[in-house]
Swiss-Prot record:
Mg(2+) 2 binds at residue 409. This is Lysine--tRNA ligase. The keyword ATP-binding applies. It comes from Ureaplasma urealyticum serovar 10 (strain ATCC 33699 / Western). Mg(2+) 1 binds at residues 402, 409.
């Protein structure tokens, strides 16, 4: 297939061919013996004056980076750590070295030898004595003053975004540090990290539509996991008392500013604890990460958040009563609930025409958007919580909470069902919902039922969407901005 190139791209390709003709193919370079990073170089010499550096017997260093700017005999290179000014004096270098410098294009990756100097403006600079091209840029970088601002291009060509936008690079550095700190904190609390299968033959662990694939050798249908829950609870049955997994989850659902079909979650399970223990653990974990990384006061979706303040706690029914004036504690039948849904114009699907789904629909319709400060919402209806232990005081509800911040859910936690008979009945109820059109209903997982029949201690479980947490802590309103390579629609032709 014939490719078309711009005039600038053709010039660069001609430069490359000239180098090859001179036996100077930059792509034959296999490594660069760098003395240090650009940041370390700047740090090492920043406290010396221009005169001191000039009079010192300095050792030559080898640096490397991408050329991102040129002005006469000055240039700017960058590596992962920082940017650095370079200078080449035509009078004091071999003519071939100077010729190499003048032939460089913006975006080229170079190896440089030289010594430290400072300019009249006191800027640390590498006084170049030798230069070698180690990778040729055949594409033109975005103009440096305006950068790369098209959000579509930034997401599709993240590598380009990372080259030219420090803000984007810093977001992904913070993402890495957030996950590292999450792992460090859990390890310090006595948790064991485990790995569970991505391919699963039973659909369970969450309410979500799956991606489906086929295992050729076994001639069997598998799902890409929609949660790690079931496998982790089997670990609790097996005797682990604190386990977690940070891993990829796949849900074949819509995409918007807070949803991507492939995302990262952390799930953890603790034996012998209840919902309230997990609630405190959740708050402690998030606050620890935010404190450690100095991210306690982010801005998210236009709201300022103070993660240093104690998180609020409220029952779902109390919140509905507060915002709508409907007290579902007093509703005694599905029929009553349906009348209330009709009165308040709450839309329901066929499988949602029961007390529990209606309570949940009221909450999602009228309350979620009011929850700005970090708030633990507990007391979900049993019909929307098939893996959660029933509340002993009112079995229409379960011991579950979700954490909401700035109108969005960030965490979901349960007191886990450990009664295999109850769990079996919940799975059967899910099958009935599937018949009514609920394509997010769980399947009957008899292998998990059998595991529970061996005995699982009272257990608290938690799931946190890592991507959404990163969005919050880095003040990003779109999930695409915190995923290195988000899923995108095909380009318009």
């Amino acid at each position: 297939m014939e490719r078309k190139f711009s005039d600038q791209e053709l010039i660069r390709r001609n430069h490359l061919q000239e180098l090859k003709d001179q036996n100077k193919n930059p792509f034959l370079a296999t490594k660069v013996e760098r003395s240090m990073s650009l940041k370390d170089f700047a740090e090492e010499y920043k406290n010396f004056s221009k005169e001191e550096l000039h009079n010192m017997d300095l050792k030559k260093v080898t640096l490397a980076g991408r050329l991102i700017g040129v002005r006469q005999t000055f240039g700017i290179i960058q590596d992962f750590s920082t940017k650095l000014q370079i200078y080449i004096d035509k009078k004091n270098v071999d003519p071939e070295v100077f010729s190499t410098f003048k032939s460089l294009d913006i975006g080229d990756i170079v190896e440089l030898q030289g010594v430290a100097m400072k300019t009249n403006s006191d800027e640390i600079t590498l006084n170049v004595t030798n230069i070698k091209l180690v990778a040729k840029s055949l594409k033109v970088l975005p103009e440096k003053y305006h950068g790369l601002v098209d959000e579509e291009i930034k997401a599709r060509q993240r590598y380009l975004d990372l080259i030219v936008n420090d803000e984007s690079k810093n977001t992904f550095i913070k993402r890495s540090l957030i996950i590292r700190e999450m792992r460090n904190w859990l390890d310090s609390q006595g948790f064991f990290e485990v790995e569970t299968p991505v391919l699963q033959d039973i659909l369970s662990g969450a309410a979500a539509r799956p991606f489906i694939t086929h295992h050729n050798t076994l001639d069997k249908q598998y799902y890409l996991r929609i949660a790690t829950e079931i496998a982790l609870k089997k670990c609790i049955v097996g005797g682990f008392e604190k386990v977690y997994e940070i891993g990829r989850i796949f849900r074949n659902e819509g995409m918007d500013s807070t949803h991507n079909p492939e995302f990262t979650s952390v799930e953890l399970y603790v034996a012998y604890v209840d919902l309230w223990y997990i609630m405190q653990l959740t708050e402690d974990l998030i606050r620890h990460i935010a404190t450690k990384l100095k991210l306690l006061n982010p801005t998210f979706r236009g709201f300022s958040v103070d993660l240093n303040k104690p998180f609020k706690k409220a029952h779902m029914v109390d919140l509905i009563n507060e915002h709508v004036g409907v007290n579902f504690f007093e509703v005694k039948s599905d029929e009553q609930a349906l009348e209330l849904a009709k009165k308040h114009h709450v839309k329901l699907l066929d499988h949602q025409k029961n007390f529990g789904h209606i309570v949940n629909a009221f909450f999602e319709t009228f309350v979620e958007e009011k929850l700005i400060e970090p708030t633990f919402v507990y007391g979900h209806p049993v019909q929307v919580s098939p893996l959660t232990k029933k509340n002993q005081e009112d079995p229409r509800f379960v011991d579950r909470f979700e954490l909401f911040i700035c109108q969005k859910e960030f965490a979901n936690a349960y007191s886990e069902i450990n009664d295999p008979i109850d769990q079996y009945e919940r799975f059967v109820a899910q099958l009935e919902e599937a018949k009514l059109g609920n394509d997010e209903a769980n399947e009957l997982d008899m292998e998990f039922i059998e595991a529970l029949e061996y005995g699982m201690p009272p257990t608290g479980g938690l799931g946190i969407g890592v991507d959404r947490l990163v969005m919050l802590l880095t003040s990003n309103d779109s999930i695409r901005n915190v995923l290195l390579f988000p899923h995108m629609k095909d380009k318009a032709k």
